Amino acid sequence: MKLQFKHQKFQADAAKAVVDVFAGQPYLTPTYMIDRGSETRLTDTDEEFTGWANQKLIPALTDDMILERIRKIQRANQIKPSDKLEGRYNLTIEMETGVGKTYTYIKTMYELNKAYGWSKFIVVVPSVAIREGVFKSFQITQEHFAEEYGKKIRFFIYNSARLTEIDRFASDSNINVMIINSQAFNAKGKDA
């Protein structure tokens, strides 16, 4: 059985609102060198290790401009305008339970990729149960979004025992999502 997803205007509007915050940012996909650590041995067979990162915001997009765009979107949606930026562009999509938050932020990732070339996303959730639900949502929406955008997201659950996943996250130019529960940040050793 294949699930059918309807296009909901409020979900598209939420994704567009996030994309609009960064209007003026050019579409770029820069590369950078992956730091292989201090134990590297140089040989004539060593590869050049290239990784991918989201392009930094251009200097013309100042914090004041970003804040004013956020306020404009908030006013248009009858939301009390923010007094200041929270963190460095900490944007939140708030919706009622069961209306498609996960769908909306997956759509937002595709739209940010389409508009600006951004391809690295980290989803931090408060619990293992929610992490598993988010992972399942990525699985069941994969084909739907692939049909709409012509590409698939590579997603994975962070596990400190599988560091090759993080290496792939950094070295793959496609859209990549790491799903992690907040407890994993503080975990040590095998608990991470």
Question: What feature does the model see in each segment?
Answer:
Residues M1-A192:
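RecA-like P-loop NTPase motor core of helicase/translocase proteins
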